[in-house]
Amino acid sequence: MRLSTHPTLDRFDAVPAASYRPGHGAVRAWLYLLAVLVVAMVAVGGATRLTGSGLSITEWRPVTGVVPPLDAADWAVEFDKYRDTPQYRILNQGIGLDGFKTLYWWEWGHRLLGRIVGLVFFLPFAWFWARGMLGRRLLLGLLGLGLLGGLQGAIGWIMVASGLQPGMTAVAPLKLALHLTTASLILAGLVWLAAGTRPRALAPAPEPVRVVAGLLPALVLVQIWLGGLVAGSKAGLLYNTWPDMDGVLVPPARVLFDKVPFIENFIDNLALVQFNHRLFAYLVVVVAIAHAIQAARTASGSAAAGRAMGLAALATAQMGLGIATLLLHVPLWAGLAHQVFAMAVLIMATVHARLARGVPAATAPTGAEVPIGLEALAGRGA
């Protein structure tokens, strides 16, 4: 039996949620499946970046690109296209066909997984909508995520195209950070909607807890953006000491701000890019720990306090993993683990923020339910 200083939370948990609709269990499972696929997409994308495979496919063919090279002639054509890229001419001239195939399969797998995510989204979405299983807010949220997913595919190609420009051997860091952050936004949106389909009501957390809980996903997203800049520019290889940066806690201004115009330092100055990622990590962890203490004091024994404590632990562990990755000079396994674990922190922060808002209890109906999907079409024809 759970002891709580907020018995209303237990009472709310015993009654249905107002927003819950029949079939929401299937919808919730589908949303979490999509979230898992997006995390897998981020993981494969990270491996593609860390192995230098992202520029191995030089064309964007959303439909026909699903078919990989099937014979020696097909492979020769694809290899010839890659040998015409700056990355090959500057970095990989010694690579043979077998080495190229390794690069190619990583990028092809990443793109294939993107297509699978699209199918797993749109086919069940159409089915759920047709059966009237999506409430209005959920429907609008899913439509927004669908549009964002389509935009993400275009951003991915724009990112790759930036690495095919003369003199480039990798994609532009700014575009990589945008690609990673957009994927993270999609993940957060899926988890937010899934948490909102909870079948049982939940009382909101105290207002101070709700406010900080709502702030934390935004802070995590900013940190993911900064991490994307570090990954894209390889700034993690510049200073591999901690807590100092090659003997100083804060590099001098002449090092952090040596580019003109000033704004370019935040994207292209590797020292400042790494420093910002370090500094913001400290901020996220401090806010998460302070929030856990706040929740323990104002909502002792509640689920919100437990979630806040779990989030603080995850954020601290992620910072520790980031430090280890830095000290080890960013080996593939550590860099990939750090990127994937960031998604775990974001998921926890998003679920916590959504549930802290509460899920209202169902009340007696005050009027006819608004039909949705095919129910609405049938009603018009009646």
UniProtKB/Swiss-Prot annotation:
Q: Which organism is it from?
A: Methylorubrum extorquens (strain PA1) (Methylobacterium extorquens)
Q: Which reaction does it catalyse?
A: Fe(II)-heme o + 2 A + H2O = Fe(II)-heme a + 2 AH2
Per UniProt, subcellular location reads as: Cell membrane
Spell out the molecular function terms from Gene Ontology.
metal ion binding; oxidoreductase activity, acting on NAD(P)H, heme protein as acceptor
Name the Gene Ontology biological process terms. Answer: heme A biosynthetic process
The pathway it acts in is:
Porphyrin-containing compound metabolism; heme A biosynthesis; heme A from heme O: step 1/1
Q: What is this protein called?
A: Heme A synthase
The family annotation for this protein states: Belongs to the COX15/CtaA family. Type 2 subfamily.
- Name the cofactor(s) required for activity, per the record: heme b
